């Protein structure tokens, strides 16, 4: 996974479409005025957040994030969105978006299923601050737009949960066509599992057979720059969402046999179990610092069968309980239950 975000040139055109001048946005964001002139626009997480705050401040339109995330013109879709649109189903599209997102940024799309619900969440892995509300709006609108266009029907989330304080409820509920909960413990888009299983009328196996191998080759090339242990831990962190992926699952992600993966890990003096523990520990710290999730919910997302198992593991890692660790590491901007509206 890259440590920088690649900003699509399509964003510049979208800004112009909604009446915003890119240079004014850059000035407001405190970013280099020549940023958008680069052939490949790469920014840090901090710069990305500044960019979206700049867009919000210049626009003053509470719906700007929803507009930017809902692209109607397929010719402006990036390769990840096109691959998603050609997928077999909404589920397949979500999985491809999560997998290929690694190519463009240090961000993860996490998909967690529980009962008859499927929750989609975005995690900014290198963030030291709360993500701008406009960015969340755009990401959620993007997911819903792909689902609606792919199925050819008005696929609506079951609910949307937002950490920020309540603002513009009617606007959000009209766009997503579902209840919106403000002051939530996390930003999450929740679908009925039945809707996630819907087939895509836009499915194109022939074109997907051309595009997917190219994306897989890029992903393989990028992952090859890391040790096998780093690759395994990254995959585990992406797949740990209410489940505990096994060696066979991870080997499949790497296009390796389980025996080959075991041999390579042994060569690096690593074990699958230790990498699982490392991934859980790092994710636990991320959840405790950057969300106000209840501890039993955190345990579930880390693949533990019950909260007590998580508490014991965490105490083994840190020598203290999750709640005490969270309290001792809390500082301004790190942990907060609500986020102010961008407009």
For each feature predicted by the language model, list its residue ranges.
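Short hinge/gating elements
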Residues: 77-83, 125-129, 196-197, 217-219
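N-terminal low-complexity or simple alpha-helical regulatory segments
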Residues: 1-120, 142
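Generic solvent-exposed, charged/amphipathic alpha-helical segments
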Residues: 56, 98, 140-144, 148, ...
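Extended mid-to-C-terminal alpha-helical interaction segments
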Residues: 166, 170-343
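Short, contiguous, pocket-lining structural segments
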Residues: 3, 17, 131, 135, ...
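DNA-contacting interfaces and partner/effector-binding or oligomerization modules
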Residues: 109-197
């Amino acid at each position: 996974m890259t440590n920088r975000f690649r900003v699509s040139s399509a964003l510049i055109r979208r800004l112009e479409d909604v009446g915003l001048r890119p240079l004014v946005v850059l000035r407001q964001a405190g970013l280099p005025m020549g940023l958008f002139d680069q052939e490949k626009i790469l920014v840090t997480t901090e710069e990305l957040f500044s960019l979206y705050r700049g867009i919000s401040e210049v626009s003053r339109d509470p719906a700007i994030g929803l507009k930017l995330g809902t692209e109607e013109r397929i010719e402006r879709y990036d390769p990840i969105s096109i691959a998603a649109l050609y997928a077999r189903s909404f589920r397949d599209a979500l999985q491809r978006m999560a997998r290929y997102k690694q190519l463009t940024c240090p961000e993860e799309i996490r998909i967690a299923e529980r009962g008859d619900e499927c929750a989609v969440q975005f995690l900014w892995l290198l963030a030291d601050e709360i993500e701008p509300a406009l960015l969340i709006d755009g990401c959620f609108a993007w997911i819903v737009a792909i689902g609606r266009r792919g199925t050819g029907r008005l696929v609506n989330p079951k609910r949307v949960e937002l950490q920020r304080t309540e603002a513009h409820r009617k606007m959000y509920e009209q766009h997503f066509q579902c209840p919106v909960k403000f002051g939530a413990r996390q930003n999450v888009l929740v679908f009925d599992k039945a809707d996630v299983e819907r087939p895509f009328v836009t499915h194109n196996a022939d074109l997907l057979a051309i595009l997917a191998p190219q994306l897989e080759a890029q992903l393989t090339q990028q992952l090859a720059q890391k040790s096998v242990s780093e690759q395994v831990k990254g995959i585990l962190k992406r797949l740990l969402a209410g489940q505990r992926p096994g060696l066979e699952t991870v080997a499949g992600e790497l296009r390796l046999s389980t025996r080959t993966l075991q041999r390579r890990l042994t060569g690096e003096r690593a074990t699958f179990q230790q990498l699982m523990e490392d991934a859980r520990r790092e994710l636990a710290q991320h959840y405790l610092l950057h969300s106000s999730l209840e501890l039993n919910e955190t345990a579930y997302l880390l693949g533990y069968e019950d909260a007590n198992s998580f508490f014991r593991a965490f105490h083994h890692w840190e020598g203290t309980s999750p709640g005490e660790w969270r309290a001792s590491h809390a500082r301004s901007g790190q942990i907060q239950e609500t986020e102010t509206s961008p407009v």
